[in-house]
Amino acid sequence: MFDKLEKILAYDNVFLSGGAGVGKSFLTNELIKSYRKQKKLAIALGSSALSAFNIGGVTLHSFFCLGYCDDMMKLSVLDRNQKQKEKLTKLKELLKTIELIIIDEISMVSANVFEMIGFRLKNSQFNGKILVVGDFFQLPPVIKEKKETLFNHSYYAFSSFFWQDLNFKNIKLSQPKRTQNMEFYNHLSLIRQGFLDEKILSFFESLRIDYKELENLEDDYTLLCGINKKVNNINQEKLSKLETPLVCFKAQVKKEDKRIKDEELDSWIRSLNILEELNIKIGARIIFCVNNWDKNYYNGEQGIIEDILYEEEKIYISIIKNNGMKILLEPYTFFMEELEQSGKDFVVNILASVTQFPIKLAYAITIHKSQGMSIEKLVCDIDHIFENGQLYVALSRATNPNTLKIYSTKKINFGFYFANILKIDSNVIEFYKKHNFLDLEIQEQII
């Protein structure tokens, strides 16, 4: 399928969209491999450190030298700095050699940030193509301050002037890869767009459980909820019930480049889906937080800690996965990187690194940290749903409706409450209605 996408990218910039679990990330990674095999220069950028890691790239803030700026005014001040000017000179040289820029999780990129990216590319006279990947029906950009901007009507990247300039060819994927249950997938597809009828409501209400049923569920279920405090409390409570000794692993942080400020490094570490202090016990249920196909685990897969092994200077965690496979887990190193021009190619400079076991306790996780995961046995606590797309993201982590449960303490009518927390931004609905999408899997023009 990536060969079709590759042909389109020869002539057009592309927006690749589609619901949760349709294979957007897989297709993107296959495209990157294809470009690199052909010795074409393609750079993969993530909206966060985690999304950058998932596609083997760097963050767009790092690549485009945006610092902590969230609007053009702040960027213009930053660009007066002499060190910044040196970075921008290198960026211009690098952009001359790149044939494709990929930006993942575009829904998390604000209109202001996308406009700043446009400013960088226009100043560098970039002649390559741009592929943006994501689903605006999922989690929106994180806006720290709801201040006056050029794009007050919408904070999404598609509201920026630069988005219009790119004249994207809109493409979508529509066939489920996460679940094989088509009824479940079709219901999810409709609530993704904010559509809810009696049939859909009845389907999800049939999955509801009460507190007693929640307490009686086996520990191999993961509870998703909207607030960190509840997640931490549940995980600590479950861990405390295990009678085995507590073991703490602290992340090993190395700053390779003295130019990196401590607050910048801390912010990068926080954006990764790992813990600075990992507290575990033998017998604890864990969830993997990254994809590492070479080592036989993926983001969202679960297992139980069988043992902790100390061999000479190395430490391994023996984990029995839910499928029965046993693996010896090693610490994983994440790198904070920047790209630099080197002749006709580019080199990767390591600015900092953090090494930690890429797991968390699996009894509970937040909805925001679950994005991109596929979870087999899932309980969605819908008491604290407050963000656009959050309910859809939570429910669509499930791989099988037979092992999906919905929990709420609300005393009001379930249907009324469910409809009330099904929050979809009207700008997103209007955007998808207004644009035609070519379905890459059935090759028909969809309105």
Swiss-Prot record:
The keyword Zinc belongs to this UniProt entry's keyword annotation: no
The protein's UniProt keywords, in alphabetical order, are: ATP-binding, DNA damage, DNA recombination, DNA repair, DNA-binding, Helicase, Hydrolase, Isomerase, Nucleotide-binding
Quickly give the catalysed reaction.
Answer: Couples ATP hydrolysis with the unwinding of duplex DNA at the replication fork by translocating in the 5'-3' direction. This creates two antiparallel DNA single strands (ssDNA). The leading ssDNA polymer is the template for DNA polymerase III holoenzyme which synthesizes a continuous strand; ATP + H2O = ADP + phosphate + H(+)
Cofactor(s) essential for the protein: Mg(2+)
Matching Gene3D superfamilies: 2.30.30.940, P-loop containing nucleotide triphosphate hydrolases
EC assignment: 5.6.2.3
Q: Which GO terms describe its molecular function?
A: ATP binding; ATP hydrolysis activity; DNA binding; DNA helicase activity
Per the UniProt entry, what is one GO biological process?
DNA recombination
User: Does the record carry Isomerase as a key word?
Assistant: yes
Report the SMART domains cross-referenced here.
AAA
The entry assigns this protein to a family as follows: Belongs to the helicase family. PIF1 subfamily.
Q: How does it assemble?
A: Monomer.
What function is annotated for this protein? DNA-dependent ATPase and 5'-3' DNA helicase that efficiently unwinds G-quadruplex (G4) DNA structures. May be involved in resolving commom issues that arise during DNA replication, recombination, and repair.
Q: What is this protein called?
A: ATP-dependent DNA helicase Pif1
Gene name tied to this protein: pif1
